[in-house]
Amino acid sequence: DSPSTPAAEPLPTKEQLLELCDSVRTSLRHSKSLGPHADRIQSLLERALKDELNHTQSLDFETLQYARLDKLLTDVLDPAHRPSPLPLRFRADMALCESLQKMWRARFRDQYFSLDQVRQRSLSIGGEMRDIHFTASGMDPLESWAVSNSCRDPISELEGNQQFEPGHWWLNLACAHRDGVIGTAVEKPTKGKYGITALPLLTGREEHIRGNLYRYVREGRLSDMHVSLLTRVGTQIRILRGYRLKSTLAPHAGVRYDGLYTIRQYGNKLDAATDKYRLELLLERVDGQKSLDEVQQVPLPSQLDDWHAFKKVEAEMVRQRKGDDGLLDFKMRKEEERIDREHWRRASEFKASLGQEGCGLGLIMSV
């Protein structure tokens, strides 16, 4: 045995292992490296391979499934995550992962190949999709989930404040409603179970003004103008951001709690030409919270795994309720929104580059 991996060293718990795998997978995606925990994951994988070869397996299937070790191997072997030129150490890591993948496939057989289906099923049974159901009657055709009535239990405000740290993440608004951070699965300001006003920003757009100050804008009917916030100017509210929001702060998937913000200004006006109202909110992030840089690491790779599984479940629900044509329409709407967001992202990046070159020209353009 090498001194770095003594046989007596206990394996991490499955929770610690999941955290480690998430960290390494994040590094692979962002920097094409195993990141700051490279040595730790390498020694763990080497030990797992040695155990397989000696038939003294210390990793059970439940741990492998929980920590997403199969996904870690796939990510290391994914050509998209390969640095160029390829360092010798990374080549060795790939060979290690390939050997381990073969050993696990041989040992677990069908169980290994059906891991994703098992995870998909367990989403609804105690997982991220617990206590929510699909509904075709929602106001927003892309938010077709609601809370099942059986799960509503009042929790004290003290518990509530401890429960939601910035960076808390859900698959959709219904999941956030189920956990009590908001009072309904609709994009409007509500008080959750704990008496704190929360506003989900799912649609519309947002721009960074300076420091902790952001401007949120949306167009729509008067009922979309969050008029109740007029009386909340100067007070703190919880802000949730969803992946459909046109904002550099929007999560890549699902809905994320981003912390407490103070409403600095509220304004809405009717555009006579379009007969639409325009809402503008000036929001300032409260100091002393987990930094936005940290919050923006969420969703983690394991949460994105859940997100991809959820999308498959959702597509199947839409197909069952609305047929193939309904599913096609649903997918087209999502794709149109995605393209629209992509255009917005490119335009805002271009604007930002102009701002840097032209001494604040970007700010003038964005007003």
Q: Language model features by range: what are they?
A:
Residues 1-257, 262-367:
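Epigenetic methyl-mark regulator signature
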